[in-house]
Design a protein with these regions (language model features):
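Flexible, low-hydrophobicity surface segments
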Residues: 145-310, 414
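Helix-loop-helix junctions that connect adjacent transmembrane helices in secondary transporters/permeases
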Residues: 295-378, 542-612, 692-717, 721, ...
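Thiamine diphosphate
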Residues: 395-416, 420-422, 626-633
Length: 859
């Protein structure tokens, strides 16, 4: 028992528990986020007697007489200050880490009203952010300090919300102050808690499940097995091969497979009950890697499949082998890239309950409410379900698949109980699909001038325990492996294998991150062989408007690769003159699904009773700022002012399906659908008032038409548009650490330039981790790392100077010229860093994370 103070109010806490649990579960102070419950991420930071502390570490009994402050307890003036500063700096993306950052900001400024950059970085060092790269958070703290010293807090400008303006994001206030709700922030009356009993072995036959002891425990409501599923057991993003619950007699595929679902009155009872469920297994040999999977007598990961090959892709044009044979210079290398964890700050969570219509209402954090609806409807064998997106605490591709949504929906549908299903951080690290590890063999041929003659490659990937998006990732890796260059002869063969490892699927870059590392590293080596600079060899080979890519596509006027090269040239030359090691790499990345697959953007505008225009789209906002983009599109394409427009969060009963938030597609695809709907609304408004239009709907749809892979055309259109980038890395010649990263990105038209910068900075820091030290080790039992703090993510005090250069290049005739930028920001970073280290010590590195650097993590 303890008596202490929370936000100035005395509280009496009879039950000893973690402070985090008391603040969230009993006081419902949901600005205090639960990101890991292990003292690593900092999302739960509060002040205890004025000092920052992670709320998941102290127990309440140890807090006698102490004073606890959360964001809810800030003064009105402080709330206004931090909301403005974080909004003006562009520091808010997914928002999950932000209340913790705000608390650290207050602690610093209370003690030091004029901190320098190093002092700010040090104050934030215990708090992770996976979205922003910290640059704009640091800028927000600087601005908050300045405004606090001056005693004046401006109002955000609402005058110019047109495309091209760096406005404050729509959701800044609710994310800064913690008032916006993520699924874990929901508390439904009489809510139960559900969780899965997971497989004990990566590959085993389930012989029996005995839940009798768990069911006899007071406070346990139900234990559901595969026999309780009313519809289809298997779900999957494209291929239905992921079991919701492994049946008796069924085979486990990895340690994350769910055997049964336990439902209880509270989390403590739930965890105790799970331990009472007895599962009898026949343990079988596991498949650990693609080489084992490919063996002639290898055990099959799936009973239903006659092979462990999950996908094969072959992309060819011209005569690569012949062109290479005729080349003056030829280089071959083997490359390897690792598993990578998304490490979004918000663990997966879903809340389900019966609404007044008797439907299952599912509150989720995922990358497509309509995809969740489709898969859960098949599982339940019923259309009596609705899905509502809440705030999403980061995704990066890792929230495209089912994780908890289907389990929550099943529990409520079968038992009638409202329920929350949330993954622990260890479960999250195990369950959602990761970035594929790749093994790649590349050969490149060039002429005496460094002009690429041909590239030939073979790649192998480990797609883990189920298909997820393994096939499309492999395809994208292959179609982009040629790089953003103008040559004809190209051939690549790719194979993805099932194993009993955790699944691999979508991750920022979608396979291109892996093959770009290979082809760009080869090109840097080729430049040395030819005797020209890495910058010059790229300029000579760069695709230009009207040019033909190796896949045969003729690129449009919006193509801006050369502009990105020219933008980094002054930095490149300055580093060379100063004798600093500098590395360079380019990249391209499609916007939209492409390759002939259906790719629709849809948007509905409704004039509602408040005489405002409400924007509805099924597209999920996962931190990239889509809602702000659509409002800016609407202001640009209608006569309305910002205050006359309302953005509604994605749902499945009003908002039309606009596909997944993936593939850097939503700004362009749904943005164009919104623009078209705006045209219909504007025509209807002519000669009328908003009051006249109440109840009217205006529907916009855009179909991004492309040609399928292997289309019998000389110049197929594989994608509606591509983004282009050049990044360079400058090392400190004395320490060998990264001193500066420069990233120039062609984005078509920047809808919100400051948000574009934030995407670039965040992508660069994420891929610095990929290049230099992030790890996701998997042991001999197919068990991965369990601790968030051991992933090797970069912290605020470790980031270098990052220069984001946003290049507007007109030419695209959709979505006001905007091209998506979310993925490409992470693609060229690793090869640029690898080349810088070659310039530093003469060692060519072809495996990630890079060995023998100051960042290397020793075992």
């Amino acid at each position: 028992m303890a008596v202490f103070f929370v936000n100035g109010t005395e509280v009496n806490v009879p039950k000893n528990q973690k402070l985090l649990r008391y603040l969230r579960d009993e006081l419902h102070l949901t600005s205090v986020k639960d990101g890991c419950s292990e003292g690593a991420c900092g999302a739960c930071t509060v002040l205890i007697d004025g000092e920052p502390c992670r709320a998941c570490t102290p127990s309440t009994d140890a807090l006698e007489g102490r004073h606890i402050l959360t964001v809810e307890g800030l003064t009105d003036e402080e709330k206004k200050l931090y909301t403005y500063a974080y909004g003006e700096a562009g520091a808010v993306q997914c928002g999950f880490c932000i209340p913790g950052m705000v608390i650290c900001t207050k602690a610093l400024l209370d003690q030091n009203p004029d901190p320098n950059e190093n002092e700010i970085k040090n104050a934030l060092r215990n708090n992770y952010c996976r979205c922003t790269g910290y640059v704009k958070i640091i800028a927000a703290v600087k601005l908050a300090a300045k405004l606090k010293r001056e005693g004046v807090i401006p109002e955000p400008s609402e005058n110019d919300w047109k495309v091209g303006s760096s406005v404050h994001r729509l959701d800044v206030e609710e994310k800064v102050l913690g008032t916006g709700k993520y699924p874990d922030d929901w508390y439904v009356p009489n809510m139960a808690y559900g969780s899965a009993v997971r497989a004990k072995y990566a590959r085993a036959r389930v012989k029996a499940i005995d839940a009798s002891k768990a069911l006899a425990m007071p406070g346990v409501y139900a234990v559901l097995t595969a026999e309780d599923i009313p519809g289809e057991n298997k779900v999957g993003h494209i291929k239905h091969d992921q079991y919701t619950l492994i049946p008796v007699g069924g085979l486990t595929h990895y340690l994350g497979d769910a055997i049964c679902l336990v439902v209880a009155q509270d989390p403590e009872t739930l965890e105790k009950a799970k331990k009472l469920v007895k599962v009898d297994y026949e343990v079988l040999p596991a498949v650990h890697n693609p080489w084992e999977a490919a063996e002639e007598n290898a055990p099959h990961v799936f009973d239903e499949e006659g092979t462990n090959v999950q996908a094969v892709r072959h992309v060819a044009r011209g005569d690569a082998a012949g062109a290479i044979a005729r080349s003056k210079y030829v280089i071959s290398q083997h490359f390897e890239t690792p598993w990578t964890e998304h490490a979004f700050l918000e663990p997966e969570c879903a809340v389900a309950y019966r609404d007044l219509d008797g439907d299952v209402m599912l509150l989720t954090t995922d990358q497509s409410a309509h995809t969740t609806l489709h898969e859960c409807s098949l599982l339940l064998g019923s259309k009596k379900i609705k899905v509502q997106n809440q705030l999403v605490g980061g995704g990066f591709g890792g929230k495209e698949d089912m994780s908890v949504q289907h389990h929550a929906a099943l529990i409520t549908y079968v038992t009638g109980l409202p329920v929350k299903v949330k993954l622990s951080r260890a479960e999250s690290l195990l369950i959602h699909p990761k970035r594929h590890p790749f093994w790649m063999d590349f050969t490149m041929g060039c002429d005496e001038n460094g002009i690429i003659q041909g590239v030939k490659a073979k790649v192998v990937s480990d797609t883990g325990a189920f298909a997820s998006l393994g096939g499309p990732v492999l395809e994208r890796a292959c179609t982009h492996a040629a790089g953003p260059y103008a040559y004809e002869n190209f051939e690549i063969e790719g194979t993805a294998y099932y194993t009993n490892n955790p699944p691999a699927g979508a991750f920022r870059g979608f396979g291109v991150t892996q093959t770009c590392f290979a082809v760009e590293t080869l090109l840097n080596e080729m430049a040395d062989k030819v005797g020209i600079t890495p910058w010059e060899i790229r300029l000579r080979n760069a695709i230009r408007p009207g040019g033909v890519l190796p896949n045969g596509q003729i690129v449009g006027a919006e193509t801006g690769l050369v502009e990105t090269l020219e933008a980094v040239k002054p930095y490149y030359d300055a580093a060379v003159r100063a004798g600093k090691p500098v590395g360079l790499a380019c990249a391209m990345k499609n916007a939209g699904v492409g390759v002939g697959l259906p790719d629709y953007g849809r948007c509905k505008l409704i004039v509602e009773a408040d005489e405002k225009l409400h924007i509805y789209s099924g597209a999920s906002c996962i931190g990239q700022g889509l809602g702000t983009v659509l409002v800016q599109m609407t202001v640009t394409n209608t006569p309305l002012r910002r205050e006359q427009i309302v953005y509604e969060r994605s749902n499945t009963w009003i908002a039309p399906d606009s596909g997944d938030t993936s593939g850097s597609r939503q700004t362009m695809i749904t943005g164009e659908a919104c623009r078209r709907a705006c045209g219909l609304f504007t025509a209807a408004l002519e000669g009328h008032t908003m009051h006249d239009l109440i109840g009217q709907e205006f529907y916009g749809e855009y179909y991004a038409k492309t040609d399928p892979l292997g289309a019998d055309k000389p110049n197929p259109v594989s994608h509606v548009a591509y983004g282009y980038a050049t990044q360079l890395c400058v090392l400190n010649p004395k320490t060998g650490r990264v001193e500066t990263m420069v990233a120039a990105h062609d984005v078509g038209k920047a809808v919100n330039p400051k948000s574009c910068e934030g995407q670039i900075e965040g992508g660069v820091v994420m891929s610095m981790g990929y290049a230099l030290r992030e790890q996701y080790p998997i042991d001999e039992n197919c068990k991965p790392i369990e601790k968030y703090g051991r992933l090797g993510l970069f912290r605020a005090h470790e980031i270098p100077d990052i220069r984001a250069i946003v290049i507007d290049k007109p030419g695209l005739d959709v979505a006001c010229g905007a091209i998506g930028i979310g993925e490409i920001t992470s693609i060229p970073t690793a090869p640029a860093i690898a080349d810088a280290y070659f310039r530093y010590d003469g060692e060519r590195r072809t495996k990630l994370p890079l060995a023998d650097t100051p960042y290397e993590r020793k075992a």
